[in-house]
């Protein structure tokens, strides 16, 4: 297969935050000194009214990136063309710097798990995902950016390491990559592997964006919860990734137990302390298990409310 464009976007976008509804009022009142915002696609593509008005107004003043959680590019179900049409319409209106999602599947037989599930990494899976990425990019009329997921299991029949899989996928399709360094740490801990070895083989030249987030340590495993500050071990990985990507756009995710905007912004700005390379990173603190309830990759906005309504939960 002929290798497609290696053009890399996002090198100079700077430091960004997730656009979360609990911060709408603060953002619209203060227009804070943030370089850019990332919006969860599903939280805005199906909503009119205030959320759509807010993202329009934010997009007039800041670069915005759309980040999806329901493309399910790894599923064996047919691609959801209705979903893609709604995503395309939102992108046409907002004009994001790029559109991203995850190397994962979220459901099968029309049922959505509302989680980002890992794939068996095989040549067959690579062929399958590459064909679907090509279709998505053709449909959207724009390049897709794909993120490495957090994983809580590995497949015994996987034959390709994830960095090599992502490299081959990017070469075949021309898609960009979103390197989530928290996911690297979470997946490596859960699999008993070395996160630095993962980065040794990662195709940094394909990276458009970096993700930072906090996680919940449960003793025997780690859950990607996005509900606390970034751990020292993840900052160490970020320092290396920042240097290796020559300063790719960096985004802090905080989706559960979201503090005020100033706290999130202050956590994001810690990235500046690590931009001179790994030797400047703080020494990692020993991992200690915590007792918090943990939900993997929460989207703390409309999706949980919608699921509660489906279940008939009372508020």
Q: Where do the PLM segments sit?
A:
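Acidic-and-aromatic substrate-binding clefts and catalytic sites of carbohydrate-active enzymes
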Residues: 24, 41-53, 72-82, 152-159, ...
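Active-site acidic/histidine proton-transfer and metal-coordination neighborhood
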Residues: 80-177
